[in-house]
């Protein structure tokens, strides 16, 4: 028997309900997380965080003793001179939030205390050996705005199996690419061996986990050819009462894209999606078999409805991750969470709150 289930039953029997609910969330916590691995070379590294660690304290996330400092820009950067040489000391320290290990005297000036997903950091590594960091946390698909008419330090959800070129990736973003002239806005990547920022060419490829100085003309929150937006918050969180959640997919390119949604590292998820089955003209709830591909026309937005099948949940708390690949060089990860509602005993002594099939007027989404 699942140890989480065993403890849950024991605690429920002893009526420690509040503690039991807390324990249940801990048992399920790893299922909706992903792991991000960062390889840091000696010298300066420009990295992009995709996950939200359970404890975001910068000293815990970047705890390797070879890491000598972590920096995040906090001012509006409009000139290349601000970012030109990473080895200048101090390099515009007033424009940065900084962390150094607390065993060093200069840590008294620390003003960077926690990390955030979808944010970029410069990390300085001392010594001669690379450092590998393994970060586990909930992924984020929240779009962040670029600084208008300025540089922003930013990374992107690159598919490492088929990384796009900068021109391919930004072609559908007028703030970063001029389709008329074919000119890409200024973008710089950090060359680790020299600690120098170098301009990228349109045909260069992006890397996952790497952050770049990107100039944005006007306002933009572009993060790829396809944006992925949950109906509420940063995940598909059904809680204990919601039965449906939407995932909005917007194709900003001029051509259709086949977008594939897959269960990441898991199969037989208790989910259904609302679509037109093969050999049918009517939409209906279809069990999610682990993969679903839909074609989104160029410039179009599609909303995909997901339903939770609580009757198929093997625990009172469910967590999983969906990957969303646009086939154009980017992939995102979306957490899925759900709970079974606690039964409510009515005056008759019968438990209430049992979910019924959707077409039966109840609140569940079983499709059988």
Language model feature labels by segment:
Residues 180-190, 300, 311-345:
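Terminal connector regions
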Residues 16-26:
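Bacterial N-terminal signal peptides
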């Amino acid at each position: 028997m699942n140890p989480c289930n065993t403890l849950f039953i024991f605690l429920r029997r002893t009526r420690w309900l509040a503690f039991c609910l807390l324990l249940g969330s801990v048992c399920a916590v790893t299922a909706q997380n992903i792991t991000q691995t960062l390889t840091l070379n000696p010298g300066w590294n420009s990295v992009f965080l995709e996950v939200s660690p359970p404890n975001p304290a910068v000293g815990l996330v970047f705890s390797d003793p070879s890491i000598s400092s972590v920096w995040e820009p906090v001012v509006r950067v409009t000139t290349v001179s601000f970012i030109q040489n990473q080895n200048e000391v101090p390099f515009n320290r007033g424009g940065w939030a900084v962390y150094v290990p607390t065993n060093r005297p200069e840590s008294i000036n620390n003003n960077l205390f926690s990390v955030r997903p979808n944010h970029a950091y410069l990390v300085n590594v001392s010594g001669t050996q690379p450092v590998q960091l393994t970060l586990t946390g909930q992924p984020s698909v929240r779009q962040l705005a670029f600084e208008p008419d300025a540089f922003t330090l930013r990374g992107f959800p690159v598919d490492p199996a088929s990384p796009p070129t900068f021109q391919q990736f930004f072609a559908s973003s007028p703030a970063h690419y001029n389709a008329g002239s074919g000119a890409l806005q200024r973008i710089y990547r950090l060359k680790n061996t020299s600690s120098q920022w170098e301009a990228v060419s349109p045909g260069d490829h992006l890397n996952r986990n790497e952050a770049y100085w990107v100039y944005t003309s006007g306002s933009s929150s572009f993060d790829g050819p396809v944006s992925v937006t949950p109906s509420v918050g940063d995940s598909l969180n059904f809680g204990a009462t919601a039965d449906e959640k939407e995932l909005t997919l917007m194709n900003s390119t001029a051509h259709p894209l086949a977008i594939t949604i897959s269960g990441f590292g898991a199969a037989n998820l208790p989910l259904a999606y609302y679509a037109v089955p093969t050999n049918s003209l009517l939409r209906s709830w279809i069990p999610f078999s682990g993969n679903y591909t839909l074609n989104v026309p160029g410039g179009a937005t599609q909303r995909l409805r997901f339903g939770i099948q609580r009757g198929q949940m093997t625990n009172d708390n469910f967590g999983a991750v969906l990957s969303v690949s646009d086939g154009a060089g980017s992939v995102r990860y979306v957490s899925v969470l759900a709970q079974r509602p606690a039964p409510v005993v009515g005056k008759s002594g019968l438990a209430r709150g049992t979910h019924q099939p959707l077409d039966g007027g109840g609140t569940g989404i079983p499709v059988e």
